Regions:
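Active-site rim helix/loop that mediates acceptor-substrate recognition in acyltransferases
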Residues: 35-64, 68, 73
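A short beta-loop-alpha structural element at the N-terminal edge
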Residues: 12-28
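Short hydrophobic/aromatic beta-strand element in the GNAT-like acyltransferase core
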Residues: 57-61, 71, 103, 135, ...
Length: 179
């Protein structure tokens, strides 16, 4: 997608694989997103480690005007993920046949340039190239994210309640990429 960048130049955003040098910029952008939108709901003690979980398959960043403007990850399913089990039951496949799209965020200053859709397309392409079906969980109150997923044709599998801590229950919408 070609659009006018924040500097006023017509420069398309681009997605590329994240590297170790990007991590501090990703944490900075995540901090901006958390302050602006409250994502993630619970700020991690170690945000760099949160962006690099042991289950991570791959991750990408989006750049706009030469700056990190967004991030997305693709992971193997974990016990905390509801969508893989819902999809595998519906499709009659193993949970291992899914990949979880996660850690998607776009800097507030970079929104409106198609970066979320660009990153989603990159993660979906990678999952499918690995023979995996992309799924995701999103906090039900994150209406901007759910609007993006539905606009991209993702299918709502269910809304479930997750117990994130003894005092915190959260409604989560579970999606699967269109087949």
């Amino acid at each position: 997608m070609k659009s006018e960048s924040v500097s006023g130049a017509n420069v398309p955003p681009r997605a590329r694989q994240r590297n170790d040098r990007d991590l501090s910029d990703c944490v900075r952008v995540l901090t901006e997103v958390h302050e602006h939108d409250g994502y993630p709901v619970n700020w991690p003690d170690l945000p760099g480690a949160w962006l690099t979980p042991p289950s991570l398959i791959a991750s990408w960043v989006a750049e706009l005007d030469g700056r990190i403007a967004g991030h997305i990850g693709l992971s193997r399913s974990g016990v905390e993920d509801a969508a893989p089990g819902l999809w595998s039951t519906r499709a009659g496949t193993s949970i291992d046949a899914t990949a979880v799209v996660n850690r998607l965020f776009v800097a507030p200053w970079a929104r409106g340039h198609g970066i979320g859709a660009l990153l989603m397309a990159r993660a979906v392409t990678e999952a499918q190239a690995r023979g995996l079906h992309p799924v995701l969980d999103v906090v039900a109150s994150d209406t901007a994210a759910t609007a993006l997923y539905e606009r991209l044709g993702w299918q709502l599998l269910a809304t479930v309640e997750q117990q994130w801590s003894p005092e915190q229950k959260v409604a989560v919408r579970c999606y699967a990429a269109a087949t």
